[in-house]
Amino acid sequence: MEIRRCMKCMHALAAGETFCSECGRPYGSVETEPFALKPGTILDGKYLVGEMLGQGGFGITYIGFDLLLEQKVAIKEYYPMSTGMVNRENSTTVVWSSAVMQKSGMEKGFDSFLKEARKMAKLGGIPGVVGVKSVFIQNETAYIVMDFIEGETLLKKLQRGGPMDYGTCISLMTPIMQALAEVHKHGIIHRDISPDNIMVQSDGKLVLLDLGAAKDLDIQGKDGNVQSSQMVAKHGFSPVEQYGQAGKIGSWTDVYAMAATIYYCCTGVLPPSATDRTIGDT
């Protein structure tokens, strides 16, 4: 049976419709990349994969549709493209370099991705944090299925409307700072907080996205610190410990990124790189 949905927005198309009435995309027209899953792919027997929403150093996020519950979802695929050691076969299967898996700790990163996704799925619905619906292995990699949050990113809101005053900013950000504190209580750190990972809903409330970058504080060390097995750094928002393999990561990592995000909200200026700030900073 043909599934007639727009691969950009997942709106249902009636028989005979040639354009999506929601976003205007011609039916059958897709935008994709050679390294991404082919739009129209079915995962875990029930998740329809649409176009890419974004990509990072270790994962790709797609818009998706739960064919059983009939609702939009966001699907995060573990695909550490920044290593240069993964490829796609037949538009689905991920092909790993055996040398990478054995020598560079990529297998450990894969296991950690799964472990943390499962832990986040058990957190329950923390207001202000995107919910995790499902975690599974397929195509030689791992997937996290999350709630799809309608709205625009905080980054787009700021680019469209300009900086906000401090009072407005703190009023908006306080709920997700409180949500982040709850996540930290469960021993999880986000590691990728920035304006493009915060969604502004139609009611003005913020939701923290992309928990696929999160890391368990209990993986290493008796001191509660974790050593980064995969480098994840975002210019202007990541603290210095995320720029090297030996960096000690903790709740302070998210605090730095949140403070940098608030700075950007109030000024519209990208904070200097943490590595640059260490030179002559007092």
What are these regions (language model features)?
Residues 86-122:
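AlphaC helix of the eukaryotic protein kinase fold
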Residues 134-135:
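Activation-segment/catalytic-loop signature of the eukaryotic protein kinase fold
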Residues 139-153, 157:
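Conserved short submotifs of the Hanks-type protein kinase catalytic core
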Residues 172-173:
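Activation segment signature within eukaryotic-like protein kinase domains
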Residues 176-188:
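Protein kinase catalytic-loop region centered on the HRD/HxD motif
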Residues 225-241:
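Conserved activation segment of eukaryotic-like protein kinases, specifically the C-terminal portion
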Residues 241-251:
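Conserved end of the kinase activation segment
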